[in-house]
Amino acid sequence: MNSILAIKNIIIESLSQALEKARQEGQIPALSVDISIEHPQKTNYGDYATSLPLRLAKATGKRPMELAEILAGYIEPGEGIAKVSVAPPGFINFTFSKEWLCNLVKTILGEAESYGNINMGGGSRVQIEFVSANPTGPIHIGHGRGAVLGSTLSNVLKAAGYYVEEEFYINDAGSQIDAFKRTLFARYQQALGKEAAVPQDGYHGQYMVELAAEMVAKYGDKYLQMPLEIAQNDLGEIGMARMLCLISDDLKSLKVDFDVWFSERSLYSGGQYKTAMDILLANNYIAERDNATWFSSTLLGDSKDNVIVRSDGTPTYFASDIAYHYNKFIERKFDRVINIWGADHQGHVSRMKAMLSALGINPERLTTLLFQMITLKRGGELVRLSKRTGEMISLSEVIEEVGADACRFFFLSRSTESQMDFDLELAKKESAENPVYYVQYAHARICSILSLAKEKGLSYSGGDTALLGEEAELELIRKMAELPEIVETVARTLEPHHLTYYAQELANAFHQFYKDCRVISDNTELSSARLKLVDASRIVLARTLHLMGMTSPQSM
């Protein structure tokens, strides 16, 4: 019984059985209750605790402490549990046995890189779509936060037993693409000394000037020799492909890769758009009025109907969304879809659910995560513009300044619905004040200890972990034990910020152990046991960093 999740289930089952025994003895009435346990803030209250007696006191007519004593009396400490106790004002506490904790070190060493994996998903197919920035310009730090959220959740869901595909949706069919093409051609003409005006609805950033210069360097005046419409379209297609390459490069520098880059255009050329519209029409969710085509989402509880085809015959962005989600659920048969969008998409969530219902798809299969934006600071001062371009600071500039690992950790460090400040100066500090440095330094320190042991010719493969018993040793093991539970929590809540908190707590537990316990000493048997603990902590910390998409440095 080496998994903390197994121990957790045993505790919950023992509480359920205790309730039933108390009912059979006439001490409490029949009750229907969800049993939950959690880690107390202080380990002297045990490793798990439940407030069940406090919640049931009124229903049973008993004082919480009295009820706690009754239930605890029916619980026998099982495998892995050394003690069951009660504490005011009505908690039941469970304490792990030292034997279980010491054996866990061997379990971690045996499972190695698979430690922390659980079979929550059972191979269920999940698609996560994130970033999906328009291919009309560089990506910014807001896109970066969405990218890190998506890739980290993918890592965690895979560790939790799901089959996961990561997808970037290319918005290559809307009016913004036409504006991009017209802008690029105007800049191309200007680069060749021709007079041309950038369209008012175009893209006015310096990057378009640079992109046009690239086109001139590669193609000369080739596109001035063609009919305007053909030249503008063909050059625009090349420019858009180049923009996608730059976006992909920026994301790769953040350690974000996609399994699929999905073109919006393919929904129309591949027939999914027509098929999805036919389904809505057959189900009476399409209405024609004001020379436009509407999706009757109010029939499904939405606050208003939504235009899907404008009066000029062009589909709206929502029309593409309908076809895209038809493709995800019906054609590609994903069991669950997770969309990670910026908070400015809040208004789209309810109509997406309505649209799925209209297509005959259970809307609960779609989860939309909305994340807040990031405020960049430098030593407390707001950073608004790039020093290099004088425009909005790009993701690539931030990565270049502080590194991908710092970006990933800070982007993950707050819950998705929380706005966050990202202090560039803090992210570069080489001190415990910087959580990225603090966590990665713990891993480097571990590697240094193991390297020293190797230099001294110390083998610890036969080390006896039963010799471990110091408070700092057991606290470190307790924290290491939590990784499968953290994976389960993040996979269930889709809130990866729990990983950053856990990483800091784990690093802190290791640093405290290092301070309190001399690893390599004249006592070779104890040294071997502690080296086993150090190696196991390396595995758990590296796994945690891997789940966050970060590196595990061997030296710093």
From Swiss-Prot:
One Pfam family named in its UniProt record: tRNA-synt_1d
EC number: 6.1.1.19
Gene Ontology biological-process annotations: arginyl-tRNA aminoacylation
Domain of life: Bacteria
Enzyme type, top EC level: ligase
MF term (GO), any: ATP binding
Motif ('HIGH' region): 133-143
Compartments reported by the entry: Cytoplasm
Chief location of this protein within or outside the cell: cytoplasm
Reactions accelerated catalytically: tRNA(Arg) + L-arginine + ATP = L-arginyl-tRNA(Arg) + AMP + diphosphate
Alphabetical list of InterPro entries matching this protein: aa-tRNA-synth_I_CS, Arg-tRNA-ligase, Arg-tRNA-synth_N, Arg-tRNA-synth_N_sf, ArgRS_core, DALR_anticod-bd, Rossmann-like_a/b/a_fold, tRNAsynth_Ia_anticodon-bd
PROSITE patterns: AA_TRNA_LIGASE_I
Keywords: Aminoacyl-tRNA synthetase, ATP-binding, Cytoplasm, Ligase, Nucleotide-binding, Protein biosynthesis
GO cellular component labels: cytoplasm
SMART domains (UniProt xref): Arg_tRNA_synt_N, DALR_1
Quaternary structure annotation from Swiss-Prot or TrEMBL: Monomer.
Family: Belongs to the class-I aminoacyl-tRNA synthetase family.
Official protein name in the record: Arginine--tRNA ligase
